[in-house]
Amino acid sequence: MTTHKTLRTLLLCAIYSFVLLFFLSSDSYLRDIFGHFDSAIFFMCGKAWMNGLTPYVDFSDSKGPLLWLIYGLGYLLNHHSYVGVFWISILFYTATLFIAYKLCRLFLEPRPAALCVAILPLALFYYEIHCEVVSEDFSYVFIMLALYCLTRILRDRDLPANTWRRLSVVMGVCFSACLLIKWNVAGMIGSLMLVAFILSFQPKRWAVCLGGMVAGAAVMALPFVLYFLLFADFGTFIQEYFINTYRTMDGKESAFVVLTWGRLMFIKERLAIIVFLGLLVFCYKRWRYAWLIFCFFIFRIGMGLAYSSKHYYMNLMPFFLFFLIAVVGYIYSKWPRWMNRLTPALCILVAIGVIYYNSKSINGHFRGSEQDREDFYTAAYIMSQVEQPRLMWYNMEAGMGTPVDALPACRYWTRQIGASEEMLKEREKMLAGGKADFVIVSRHLHEDEVVEEVTARVEAQGYVPYLEVRAFANEPKFILFGRPGWQFPPEDFHVSQWDVWLKRNIFGI
């Protein structure tokens, strides 16, 4: 593509990304800041890092430092909401859609390629698996880029050495980027790299391929390695991010999660089957691309066979693009004249349909529950009386301290799924040491914890209950505990829908 066409394509991808995320992202201006869970944890980690706390020492979770850096930059853009992350997400999705277009152009003319890209978000934002912004949203671009590189190699294995080197370096960068976001996704991308390496033997490019992959991976990882060696604790980083994260899926709590999500897992598995069948359609009469089927199965295995949360299936969605290439390409070959004329209108109609269909996952998109909002901001008002309050959660973080610059009280301030006994004991030790200004107890704890027992332990350390925060159809969800003496908001305290949409700084912090 010429520079002019490239810039025009990037601009269209950016506009489409903005529109998609404005209506479908939980971080959008249309959404309030309550109702976040995974993204609330990531935001807390990024915020803690930007405030001088040491990753994996002062705070920890099962995700990588690149994801926390993304959320830390989002925090710097806006301290008290997720709209900073929203704008960063637009950049990531712009790149994802642009790379998807480039991949389509390997097989299709510009107009059918554009229609494929317009349809693709139907899968990327599929409402049954995409309920909030998660780490997979930021992995999409690297998966798509690695798929593009492998497809180039599958299409023409006799590429010049410089092209082999360039594609290999990019795949290495993608590997390390995903390793630093969520390490099991790096294993999935490793399957694409393995196929590329195997194919490099035929044109005798294996040394160029291997060297490029190693160089790309090293360049991406080096800044983080140096940071942890010089300014943090590299050993603790390895222990927490790789070893402890692996161990969290080995225990009775994992069985509890499997039973809890079993029905959803069965429902979501049909998505994997649909994407697989679509890949078969693409590979029909294109058997040189059958290696993609092998990679698809490695991706599915990498998600976990015993337990796969619904958003894990997002990792498979980039493969759906190959089905679109096959079907859209066939339709354009049959009716080229009419389809080329209708492409702009079809792209607009498809975009509207994608947003309408996938908005099912966004509950209370334009107007959230008034009662939920009142409870959420009442809790935030109480916490705002402490400068940068330190929080501890019994169960998963839910973003209640986001509007008041709250920070983690300890390394395991929120409970990871499958938390080990050592993690739980350290949290109890921190509770006894009075590290937290506020403790939030969920009424939906894991099977090894009873609400009454947990609240008794919290109260024994001098904390008193302030209020129950309702969420999800006005059900009591969280109990806020704090030290005695904090004030409730005055009667005229109110957070309006306009405050939410304009992302006003409610507490003037």
Task: Write out the residue ranges for each language-model feature.
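Transmembrane-helix motifs of polytopic, lipid-linked glycan transferases
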Residues: 87-108, 145, 149
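Transmembrane-helix signature of polytopic, membrane-embedded enzymes
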Residues: 100-123, 140-141, 159, 166
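Short acidic/glycine- and proline-prone juxtamembrane loop motifs at membrane-interface regions
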Residues: 128-139
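Membrane-interface transmembrane helices that cradle and orient dolichyl/undecaprenyl
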Residues: 144-170, 204, 277-289, 328
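Membrane-interface alpha helices of multi-pass inner-membrane proteins
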Residues: 163-183, 189-194, 218-219, 296-304
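Hydrophobic/aromatic-rich transmembrane helices and adjacent perimembrane loops
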Residues: 187, 305-339
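Short periplasmic/luminal acceptor-recognition loop of GT-C membrane glycosyltransferases, typified by
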Residues: 190, 194, 364-448, 472-473
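Hydrophobic, aromatic-rich transmembrane alpha-helices
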Residues: 267-300
